[in-house]
């Protein structure tokens, strides 16, 4: 009887492929439909033929058959887990032990259906029976298929995937996950979302602790067409999800081994406990047997079970970092602006000591002169140092400008000749070019005799002497003006003693504003040193002129230098009592008057 039921079930399943095509076609392209369903039809036909041939030989009793299927289920669990999930955790191994020890019988599907429909005892009693019948027949046929598939499939990749899907779907109705997105958070921060269609979201109902099965939509499916359609959807979706898990495992071995742990539906409580133990945003314990009603999804919507990579987690991190860096930059700019404003305000408004400016809410840059806040004197000190630095920089710039001023070059005899003779050539040849003018000047200079050239050389030396003399006088004037200013400052303070009037014998000379010079030997030595320096400077300048100086000038310099030397020497007579015949006042006035006739000053 069981064999006949399975044969009828398979015939009904083969006849309903057109309805399945319509149900699963929504949201997919025509090429994918044709390929997937043609392959599926071929496999189903081959499996059906092999099951018919093998069942006649091997299955004599239904009891023996059920015992064989129970042992086969255990073997399939081991083989599928070893083939796909070789690196699973210890929790999965403990689940396998529980599965082995739990007694399995032909009533497993019935018990599951009772557990599914128990919350809906009042509303769905008539639908329970139809669901139980359809699920019982489907589980019977699927167990036959699996038993023979073990021999045929060998080591092929596609058949084990379908075996896993059909083996798990035979025990229960389709499982729906109510979470909108199944998120896989990789170590890099990448999120992968399994997006379900909106109609499936509405029809799904799952608790956080354990998976619950659909209440009314699952039990309303009365005919075998619905169950066959659901089984086919489970096979296809399980195939897609497992292929994705393979690719993910290649990229991230460590993470995928811990994540990909689909628990079979035979022990739903164990699977829920395993899912709870992994509290890292993972809902993958039932990925393989997820069944999707793809007839509810439209072409414009996202396809049910489509995997989308979401980079929002990384983008949020980047945005946070960019916001932090922007805030830091804004703070630094704000501080710089405040600092510059405080400098300007302190430089512009110099409040005198003792005055207190009363203002409502004064800004931090304006300090109180009488009672200033404690942190405010610091910027004042900073600005003082800044102003000193500015002054030093200005002085350095001035010195550089002075040094950079081009000194007048020494004019050669040829240059002096060209300067004077150029006028005559331009008058003779108006509109002459610069090149031709220079050529003519060179020719004339070559034709000049040696006597004329010597005259031009003497003229050049005389001009150079004038230039040097002018520079020396300007330097001395600057030095004397600075000394005079220093003396005026000292007299204003009152450090010096009151002035002494000169005697009536020297009424022709005005009295010196400064203190009368002393007649001590140190003062005499200072006067003699000044005289020596001035005479050496004069001699150096005379050597440059080479005989162009008049005799009267040299004689005047010699006479002045003799007077300037004898005056200080006369002051030394005060040191010996035998020679001390001149009063001190006369000697001091002589030293004072020497400064007017000292040469070079």
UniProtKB/Swiss-Prot annotation:
Residues 316-344 have a biased composition (Basic residues). Residues 394-404 have a biased composition (Basic and acidic residues). Residues 82-93 have a biased composition (Low complexity). It is found in: Nucleus. Keywords: DNA-binding, Isopeptide bond, Nucleus, Phosphoprotein, Ubl conjugation, Wnt signaling pathway. There is a cross-link at residues 8, 191 (Glycyl lysine isopeptide (Lys-Gly) (interchain with G-Cter in SUMO2)). Its main location: nucleus. GO terms for biological process: endosome to lysosome transport; negative regulation of Wnt signaling pathway; Wnt signaling pathway. It holds the Pfam family HMG_box. Residues 51-410, 473-514 are annotated as: Disordered. Residues 407-475 bind DNA. The modification Phosphoserine is found at residues 102, 197, 497, 502, 512. Residues 212-221, 270-282 have a biased composition (Polar residues). It comes from the Eukaryota. Negatively regulates Wnt/beta-catenin signaling during development. This is HMG domain-containing protein 4.
């Amino acid at each position: 009887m069981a064999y006949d039921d399975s044969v009828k079930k398979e015939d009904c399943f083969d006849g309903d492929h057109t309805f399945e095509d319509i149900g699963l076609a929504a949201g997919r392209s025509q090429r994918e439909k044709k390929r997937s369903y043609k392959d599926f039809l071929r496999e189903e036909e081959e499996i059906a033929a092999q099951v018919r041939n093998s069942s006649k030989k091997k299955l004599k009793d239904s009891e023996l058959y059920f015992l064989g299927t129970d042992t086969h289920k255990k073997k399939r669990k081991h083989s599928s887990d070893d083939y796909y999930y070789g690196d699973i955790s210890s929790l999965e191994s403990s689940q396998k032990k529980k599965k082995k020890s739990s007694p399995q019988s032909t009533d497993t599907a019935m018990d599951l259906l009772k557990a599914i429909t128990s919350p809906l005892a009042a509303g769905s009693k008539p639908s329970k029976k139809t669901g139980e019948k359809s699920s019982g027949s489907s589980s019977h046929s699927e167990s036959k298929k699996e038993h023979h598939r073990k021999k045929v499939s060998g080591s092929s990749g596609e058949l084990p995937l379908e075996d896993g899907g059909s083996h798990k779907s035979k025990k229960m109705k389709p499982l729906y996950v109510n979470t909108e997105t199944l998120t896989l958070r990789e170590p890099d921060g990448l999120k992968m979302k399994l997006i379900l269609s909106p109609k499936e979201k509405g029809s799904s109902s799952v608790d956080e602790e354990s998976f619950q099965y659909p209440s009314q939509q699952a039990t309303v499916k009365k005919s075998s067409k619905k169950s066959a359609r659901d089984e086919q959807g489970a096979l296809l979706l399980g195939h897609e999800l497992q292929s994705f898990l393979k690719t993910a495992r290649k990229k991230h071995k460590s993470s995928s081994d811990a994540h990909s742990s689909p628990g079979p539906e035979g022990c739903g409580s164990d699977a829920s406990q395993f899912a709870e133990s992994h509290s890292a945003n993972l809902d993958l314990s039932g990925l393989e047997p997820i069944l999707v009603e793809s007839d509810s999804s439209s072409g414009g919507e996202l396809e049910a079970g489509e995997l989308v990579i979401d980079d929002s987690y990384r983008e949020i991190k980047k945005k946070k970092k960019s916001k932090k860096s922007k805030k830091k930059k804004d703070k630094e700019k704000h501080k710089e602006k405040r600092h510059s404003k405080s400098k300007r305000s302190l430089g512009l408004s110099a409040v005198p000591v003792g005055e207190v400016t009363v203002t409502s809410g004064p800004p931090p840059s304006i300090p109180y002169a009488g009672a200033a806040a404690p942190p405010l004197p610091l910027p004042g000190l900073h600005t003082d140092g800044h102003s000193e630095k500015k002054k030093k920089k200005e002085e350095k710039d001035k010195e550089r400008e002075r040094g950079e001023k081009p000194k007048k070059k020494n004019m050669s005899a040829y240059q002096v000749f060209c300067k004077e003779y150029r006028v005559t050539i331009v008058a003779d040849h108006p509109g002459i070019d610069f090149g031709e003018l220079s050529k003519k000047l060179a020719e004339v200079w070559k034709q000049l005799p040696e006597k004329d050239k010597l005259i031009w050389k003497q003229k050049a030396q005389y001009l150079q002497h004038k230039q040097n003399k002018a520079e020396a006088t300007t330097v001395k004037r600057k030095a004397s003006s600075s000394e005079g200013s220093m003396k005026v400052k000292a007299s204003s303070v009152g450090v010096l003693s009151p002035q002494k009037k000169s005697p009536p014998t020297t009424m022709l000379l005005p009295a010196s504003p400064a203190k009368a010079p002393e007649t001590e030997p140190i003062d005499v030595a200072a006067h003699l040193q000044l005289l020596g320096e001035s005479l050496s400077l004069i001699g150096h300048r005379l050597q440059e002129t080479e005989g162009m100086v008049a005799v009267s000038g040299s004689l005047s310099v010699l006479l002045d230098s003799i007077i300037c030397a004898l005056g200080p020497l006369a002051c030394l007579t005060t040191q010996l009592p035998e020679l001390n015949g001149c009063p001190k006042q006369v000697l001091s006035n002589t030293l004072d008057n020497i400064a007017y006739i000292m040469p070079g000053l």
